[in-house]
Curated annotation (Swiss-Prot):
HAMAP family reported for this sequence: HslV
GO biological process, one term: proteolysis involved in protein catabolic process
Originating gene: hslV
Name of the protein this chain belongs to: ATP-dependent protease subunit HslV
Active site: 11
Length: 181
């Protein structure tokens, strides 16, 4: 038996669109195997002159490589989010080097929310909520409930939902970073 590579679980990223506003946030925990390595990792960033916010889940070096490629696609396609996302997904799926990268991206603009995966998927959820990472399903469930039953802002929904995920998922903490559009 060979030694198994420790699995890196590092994130919960959540994006919400509401009332013409967008917010995307993440927790700050990074774990390696069953050890917390860092509490305040920043996994979100603004792109294309502040018109988009993106977050990543997965292996950090892989995600940063994909973020660089995505930013280049946004530049190449004059900030057209759909086109840049599809072109990145095509490259990611077909390029021999890129398809080995283990990460996912969540992207929001003021009117659109997308998930971009390494399997070539570009997903635009109908409800304007995107969630990726180890605690994503907890954050997604909380965000959907808050969207239906409250008048909280996009930023407040992201904060409360990530807090809920942090209370449930051992790979998610409450060092929350949020960017809004």
């Amino acid at each position: 038996m060979g030694q198994q590579k420790p699995q890196i679980r590092s994130t919960t990223v959540l994006g919400v669109l509401r009332d013409g506003k967008a917010a995307l946030g993440s927790d700050g925990q990074m774990t390696l195997g069953n050890t917390v390595m860092k509490h305040s990792t920043r996994k979100i960033r603004s792109l294309y002159q502040g018109k988009f916010v993106t977050g990543f889940a997965g292996a950090t070096a892989d995600a940063l490589t994909l973020l660089e490629r995505f930013e280049a696609k946004l530049e190449a396609y004059s900030g057209r989010l759909d086109r840049a996302a599809v072109e990145l997904a095509k490259d990611w799926r077909t390029d021999k080097y890129l398809r080995r990268l283990e990460a996912m991206l969540a992207v929001v603009s003021s009117d659109k929310a997308l998930i971009i995966s390494g399997t070539g998927d570009v997903i635009e959820p109908e409800d304007g909520i995107v969630a990726i990472g180890s605690g994503s399903m907890y954050a997604l469930a909380a965000a959907r409930a808050l969207m239906k039953h409250t008048t909280l802002s996009a930023e407040e929904i992201v904060r409360e939902s990530l807090q809920t995920a942090a209370e449930i998922c051992i790979y998610t903490n409450d060092h929350i970073a949020i960017e809004t559009l």
